[in-house]
């Protein structure tokens, strides 16, 4: 018998991370199932980043803090709100643990025009999709003290 990939039952092996299917959605109203998209694989997880002031942005692709206007997929601070890069899409999640599939469905059905800190209190997650639509960041506001710094926690996913 040929050896099966993964564990003995063909499933993932211990320590492996299975891909997350962007299209694994329940049927929509009317009984249709949304189209299935390529799976999103975990990139980096639980990265906590602090931008000292508005001269810095969060590089969502690399998971680091960079000087403003130096990367194409970013999250910037604009007063008391976040400002995603141009051509990025955002969605403020209802639950506490959205998946990439939840983010895609939310972005495509209820995109967020603004991301004010007040709406994101208590680490309420929000999603930002890259301009090329191949990456998703699930972001939580950790702190936004009056001194101008902002701290976030980010999980990033990318398509195969």
Question: Residue spans of the language-model regions?
Answer:
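N-terminal "domain-start" segment
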Residues: 2-117
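Extracytosolic low-complexity repeat regions of secreted or lipid-anchored proteins
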Residues: 96-160
